[in-house]
UniProtKB/Swiss-Prot annotation:
Residues 39-249 form the YrdC-like domain. It is an enzyme of class 2 (transferase). Belongs to the SUA5 family. This is Threonylcarbamoyl-AMP synthase. GO terms for biological process: mitochondrial tRNA threonylcarbamoyladenosine modification; regulation of translation; regulation of translational fidelity. It comes from Schizosaccharomyces pombe (strain 972 / ATCC 24843). NCBIfam families: L-threonylcarbamoyladenylate synthase. It holds the Pfam family Sua5_C. GO terms for cellular component: chromosome, telomeric region; cytoplasm; cytosol; mitochondrion; nucleus. Required for the formation of a threonylcarbamoyl group on adenosine at position 37 (t(6)A37) in tRNAs that read codons beginning with adenine. Likely catalyzes the conversion of L-threonine, HCO(3)(-)/CO(2) and ATP to give threonylcarbamoyl-AMP (TC-AMP) as the acyladenylate intermediate, with the release of diphosphate. Required for normal translation, by ensuring translation fidelity at the level of codon recognition, appropriate translation initiation selection and maintenance of reading frame. Also involved in telomere replication. InterPro entries: DHBP_synth_RibB-like_a/b_dom (IPR017945), Sua5-like_dom (IPR006070), Sua5/YwlC_C (IPR038385), Sua5_C (IPR005145), T(6)A37_SUA5 (IPR010923), TC-AMP_synthase_SUA5 (IPR050156). GO terms for molecular function: ATP binding; DNA binding; double-stranded RNA binding; L-threonylcarbamoyladenylate synthase; nucleotidyltransferase activity; tRNA binding.
């Protein structure tokens, strides 16, 4: 299969604002694109999604996604095949409007359609009310909410999407290309990251091409992703609410939403959860992810000199000759290049000075170090506050070994 890349210009995509100021900006999505290559590319992608079982790669504000119609099992299976994704790893569904989400949920409740449509606030009748503060504050954006599958005999999405569970996650992406594609195709898209399974998530179209060339028909190139890590996934169906996967919206931001969300906790995986009989509720809860070919060593609460000493000891214990290794280093706030031995072939990359910069650069830099042929990547850990929770979640899953130093 030939994989084509079509460039889209986000400046040409616009959305009509609602006439009612009290209405959510994306209660209904009306997209406007003048005749252009961008419009042709989006119409081509929408045609593939509607009329074939092949997935299409497209940019979101978090990472590039690989999408197919969440309602059609054969289309969803094509995502798993292209990525070589484990069958028990569920997918997140992407919608372009609250109206589209409402229609998707109502499709599973045919007896309730006429009754719900007569309600003045039908979105509140079908979407669990606990999520309304988050939807108002964070949608569109990098937040996924867990919804119930009420009738397993008539689910709103393919059972492949849910991995056979009684819940599924859904979000409304912020990226104009993602919103336009979902709106034009009028298809709720099941879309994990558009990379080969276990590889670092793609934040550029070329990352997608490197992993999935020959396996998918089309990549929409909308430039670099702005957030750089996947969405936060929350479960508000339990008390207290739980963050199942840290991501683009921080714990602190969610807790500031008030109500039940003030008590939000973070899911912590047990070692037993990683066994084969554990079925994750959302992506990112079970399998190793985000890993480059090089071996990643994560150092928590270590200075650069102490980290290098631990690394030398690690190589000695593994029987690895240090002089034959090419070493990459990812620094953030404390480490600096001058503190490492000058006689060793290090490749230094600075992830950034704050959480926003680090999340945006992390996956791209892991891929960059792979391209430079390093054997090991030494990574400076960060504090698990704000964006740091998602950063350390991703680094922990990418790392072969995590070294914990004394807390300061």
């Amino acid at each position: 299969m030939e994989t084509k890349i079509q460039t889209v210009d986000t400046r040409l995509i616009s959305f009509e604002k609602p006439s009612n100021d009290s209405e959510h900006p994306f209660e209904h999505t009306r997209v406007s694109i003048p005749p252009s290559e961008t419009r042709s590319a989006l119409e081509n992608a929408a045609n593939i999604l509607r009329n074939t079982d092949y997935p299409v790669a497209f940019p979101t504000e978090t990472v590039y996604g690989l999408g197919a119609d969440a309602r059609r099992t054969e289309a969803v299976l094509s995502i798993y095949k292209a990525k070589n994704r484990p069958a028990d790893n569920p997918l997140i569904v992407h919608v372009a409007s609250l109206d589209q989400l409402r229609r998707l949920l109502l499709s599973a409740y045919p007896k309730a359609k006429s009754e719900v449509k007569n309600q003045a606030h039908d979105s509140e009748e079908i979407i669990p009310k606990v999520y309304l503060p988050l939807i108002k504050k964070f949608w569109p954006g990098p937040l996924s909410i867990l919804l119930p599958v009420v009738d397993e005999a008539n689910p709103p999405v393919s059972p492949i999407v849910t991995a056979g569970q009684k819940t599924f996650a859904v979000r409304m992406p912020q990226h104009p290309v993602a919103l336009a594609l979902i709106s034009i195709s009028d298809s709720p898209l099941a879309a994990p990251s558009a990379n080969a399974s276990t590889r670092p998530s793609p934040t550029l179209a070329k990352h997608v091409y490197n992993d999935l060339q020959g396996k998918i028909p089309l990549i929409l190139d909308g430039g670099a992703c702005g957030v750089g890590v996947e969405s936060t996934v929350v479960n508000g169906l339990c008390d207290p609410p739980v963050i199942l996967r840290p991501g683009g919206i921080s714990l602190e931001e969610i807790q500031s939403s008030g109500g039940a969300w003030e008590r939000t906790k973070v899911f912590v995986a047990k070692k037993s959860d990683m066994e084969t009989d554990f079925i994750p509720q959302t992506p990112g809860m079970k399998y190793r992810h985000y890993s480059p070919t090089a071996k990643v060593l994560l150092f928590v609460n270590y200075t650069e000199s102490d980290a290098y000493g631990v690394f030398e000891k690690y190589l000695s214990e593994q029987g690895i000759t240090k002089e034959k290794q090419k070493i990459g280093v990812l620094c953030s706030k404390r480490w600096n290049e001058e503190s490492f031995p000058s006689h060793c072939p290090f490749v230094f990359l600075h992830m950034g000075r704050d959480g926003h910069e680090i999340t945006k650069n992390l996956f791209a830099q892991l891929r960059d170090l792979d391209l430079q042929g390093v054997d090991f990547v030494l990574v400076e850990g960060v504090s698990e506050e704000n964006e740091g929770l998602a950063i350390m979640n991703r680094l922990g899953k990418a790392a072969s070994v995590v070294f914990e130093g004394p807390s300061h």
